[in-house]
Amino acid sequence: MPVSRSASPRGRALALLAGVALVATIAGSAAAARGGNANAGFKTSVPAMLVPGADAPAGVVIDPIISVGDTLNSGFTFDSIPDGISLTVNGRGRADLWVNHETSLVPFPGILTDFTNSHVDRLVMNQHSAGILSATDAIPSDANYQRFCSNFLAGPAEGFDRRILFTNEEATDVVNRTGLAWPAIPAVGSDPEQAGVVVALDIKSGEYRTIYGMGRHNHENSVAIPGFDELVVLSGDDTFSAPSSQVYSYIASDTDAVWNDEGALWAFVGEDGFNDYGDLADGDDITGHFIPVPRDVAVGDQNALETWSNANNVFQFIRIEDIAYDRNDSNVVYLADTGEPRAIPDPATGRLMRGPSGTMGPYPNGRIFRMVLDEDDPTQVDSLSILINHDPLGPGVADALHNPDNLETTANSLLIQEDTGSHNQFDLGAGPSARVWQYIFATGELRAVLEVDQSLDEDPAYDVGGFVARAGGWESSGIVDASAIWGPGWFLLDVQAGSLILESEPGFLGPNPVIFEREGGQLLRAYIPGA
């Protein structure tokens, strides 16, 4: 039985649920935006979940747009775990946003689960007020995809002849693609397969499809890189078993070849004996190349790809998160590696391995890598070096960059969002919450310009849960340059408020008892002068 979106949040699972719901009051409804303009669209009344960071320049503006649980007059409800964001401007005073929701019906942890599978919203926004005029599903929950993280909208700038949105499953579970996604048993669904795929959406036609040849792994993002004769899409493995992450490139002749999955997958290999994160130190600058991945491996399961990568000495990062290309030199690519405290050298092989629980190794904070692709051949890497490295500062240091996750670039800056591990979280008031950092290309300055505000946690007006997160327990995500809408320095981003439980309801998925929860969150815009 598929779970699909409906006007009522609870209606999405009526056939599955039993019990009495606990629902927090969300102070948002289908009302006009601030200022009283009835045509300006909906704006949330939930307080902003971001504040200026410790190093923010004067003039930062933070404007919340829509919060999890907000419902429009159409019945559309903004769902939990908002993540990747892409946008277009349509020239009629409106902009279209595509917003991922990293939801899943596969319980984790324990018996806790979301109300929906992952899905992508299309939000139509008033360009002047940033109010939401309408909203629909671009990729619905009943497509049975899981945990969409970042997304990327490829278009003419990247060599595509039409706009294709790439969205990505960060998941390893076996799920039914028809019927009820989980449990993957014939009694409730069919077409079972392992998750971890890339999904392409033609935003004009509305058609979407899986691109299996892009590889099955924990995709954080798939980013098209401009400037080559063929289309090049880079992706990284945001593995759940770090350190065992790789960087891949999908190369195809044109947009139709991508859409019809006629391209080929390639994997990055370092040269001169450099084959993992631990081999590279500050000041090192290595070369490398991409090698072809056999088609049967690329479309196989995640274990097959991991086994093949090890056998072929593919460079092992710790845990690649987002990717962004330089807006001035598009063959320069930035890679966020979130690090892993349990990553330690294997005494038998010298390569990194995962230590036991409680291990505190030398890589707790992560790095930003800088990769330079050959201008004429995207399979050749002229340089791989470390741009930012805060691993040596150790865990729990307030001034360190903690576990970089999402990235965005402008002509001036690299924007970096943190997803802090427990080792980099603090008692409330004793250290920062998760931040957004700005790295200024001209000077190399790194400054914290935004910070997540967790003050709504356990507010009885919003939260029916009983757990208070430590500082850093919430994260911001999905940052994207919004200068096309509002001018330089403007960004769209969202907040995932994992311990802000708006709704909790016991029920069943097939024969399995679960607890459905809706976590809080928010979509915002922010102005950062000089960014």
List PLM regions with ranges:
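N-terminal secretory signal peptides that target proteins for export/translocation
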Residues: 1-9
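Cleavable N-terminal signal peptides
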Residues: 19, 30-31
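Gram-positive Sec-dependent secretion signals
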Residues: 9-15
